[in-house]
């Protein structure tokens, strides 16, 4: 029986977007009666479900890749389909196994780099690997464009991300207290645009500013700068930083706000981009209107006049 083999270096209990995506793909494969197995790293920790269909490979880098490739060659059939979390190194190992391989494309990993290696070695390696895949699955039309730019002969399929509507749904009522409650959630990096949002709130007349509350969820390297900016602009009573939001609390986080806002920007020369913006879809599923910027793949997640 043909199986789907999900090969990924990121899988729960890791918290990254690729980990969550691969977990959801695996879950939906099972619900639709497909035979599926996940091959991932032992360093990801103990599988939350203790699932026998999740195989964790042990080893340091180099040895780890050899063991993964060896496992794929010995424990998969010729007609199995391998779906990889990214094109490298997951995609390379899937391709070397000799099986039919499909690679997920997210956005940032396809942006050009500045170094000699990235310009003249990585560029051609990436082009060949993407072209060699049976298919590349892009999470947005923006990411599809990046794939075609990197590898014009690659077979690209655009499938925007979705959410589980049985899980993401309204769980709490809006506060209706005369205050406009905004929320934002992401890894806190400069390109996410939280500093822009903070400055916009600061620029408002006091009679409007007093009726706004912003709650920012997530951690990251730019958090201290954002906290300092809020303090500098005398917004400590207006803006709160919640830190990491556990999956079990996400629906309440989204549902309790009036509007979800994320002002991601594209900064030339930096390898940062919003390939899709799953948080926008999650927030809308929880009954919260969203505001986003026309950057990266966000237009696929936010439809003007239809929830955003």
Regions found by a protein language model. Name each.
Residues 255-273, 288:
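Acidic donor-binding loop of glycosyltransferase active sites
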Residues 224-248:
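Nucleotide-activated donor-binding/catalytic signature segment of Leloir-type glycosyltransferases, i.e.
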Residues 280, 285, 289-292, 302:
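Short hydrophobic beta-strand element within catalytic cores of glycosyltransferases
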Residues 84-90, 105:
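Short His-centered aromatic/hydrophobic patch
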Residues 5-7, 174-192, 198-201, 260:
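Conserved donor-binding/catalytic core segment of Leloir-type glycosyltransferases
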Residues 244-245, 252-257:
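Short alpha-helical donor nucleotide-sugar binding micro-motif in glycosyltransferases
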Residues 102-119, 133-135:
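A short, histidine- and acid-enriched strand-loop-helix "catalytic/donor-clamping" loop
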Residues 142, 162:
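Carbohydrate-associated surface elements
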